[in-house]
């Protein structure tokens, strides 16, 4: 029994052209769906175009089902551009980026996650980013988790109820070789709906640092993300799972010796997703 003959290069190129045309047609079809979505939202009185929970779910599903020779980095980047651009079409906005610790890593991250259609505004400091988001109609801000010692307790500016809040932690699919793997927070004006609340971010003020804090918080599933001196003691930025009650966080800190504990929620985001064990070529 002889093997079936391989297709010619001409036939393969025709198939590739047909696939490309289909992909373009599907993108245009997606655009028509977005047109309808915009019209429905107008009739219903509007609503935020940002859906952090949905975006996180979409990116994880894409990463989990991906197979073949096309790198996951490429697939993730394409979908981030698609999602972010169509969000921009629904609600034009800019992304404010803190480049105080270096322009290249933050710009790479901004362009990977938000594409090139969404305007990117650089600021030399966290305060500029927070102010830009507060003063913009639909703007987003992007801040490195490690904003540097000069940033101080920057998260305290997010404490007022109407101040911008953390809505996402990027990248959605974490892995050691991620092309835009710098851990960043995305901030926006408080969302009425569509927010992810797997991890709650708390601004904590207390008397001083104690070495027992990290272990005490780890025992309840919480984590210290940042710490800085404050005018009346110490300021911490803490992430706690939504299943961990605020009272449990307070009790853990008090049990570790803390005094004068005060807390304010400054945002929330989807649960982190470890993509290091994915096998896209399997």
Region annotations inferred by a language model:
Residues 1-282:
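Domain-level signature for soluble enzymes in the chorismate/prephenate branch of the shikimate pathway
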């Amino acid at each position: 029994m002889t093997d079936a003959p391989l297709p010619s290069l001409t036939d393969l190129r025709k198939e590739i052209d047909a696939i490309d045309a289909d992909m373009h047609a599907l993108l245009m079809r997606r655009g028509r769906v977005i047109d309808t979505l915009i019209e429905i939202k107008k009739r219903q009185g509007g609503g935020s175009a940002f859906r952090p929970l949905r975006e996180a779910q979409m990116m994880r599903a894409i990463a989990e089902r991906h197979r073949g020779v096309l790198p996951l980095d490429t697939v993730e980047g394409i979908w981030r551009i698609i999602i972010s651009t169509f969000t921009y079409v629904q609600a034009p906005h800019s992304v404010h980026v803190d480049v105080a610790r270096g322009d290249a890593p933050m710009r790479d991250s901004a362009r990977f996650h938000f594409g090139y259609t969404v305007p990117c505004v650089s600021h030399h400091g966290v305060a500029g980013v927070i102010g830009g988001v507060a003063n913009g109609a639909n703007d987003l801000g992007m801040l490195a988790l490690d904003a540097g010692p000069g940033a101080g307790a920057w998260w305290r500016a997010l404490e007022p109820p109407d101040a911008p809040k953390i809505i996402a932690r990027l990248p959605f699919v974490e892995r050691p070789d991620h092309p835009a793997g710098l851990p960043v927070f995305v901030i926006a004006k408080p969302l009425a709906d569509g927010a992810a609340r797997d991890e709650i971010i708390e601004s904590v003020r207390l008397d001083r640092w104690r070495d027992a804090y990290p272990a005490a918080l780890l025992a309840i599933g919480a984590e210290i993300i940042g710490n800085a001196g404050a005018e009346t003691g110490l300021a911490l930025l803490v992430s706690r799972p939504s299943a961990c009650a605020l009272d449990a966080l307070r009790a853990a800190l008090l049990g570790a010796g803390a005094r004068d504990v005060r807390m304010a929620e400054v945002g929330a985001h989807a649960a982190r997703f470890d993509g290091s064990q994915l096998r896209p070529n399997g």
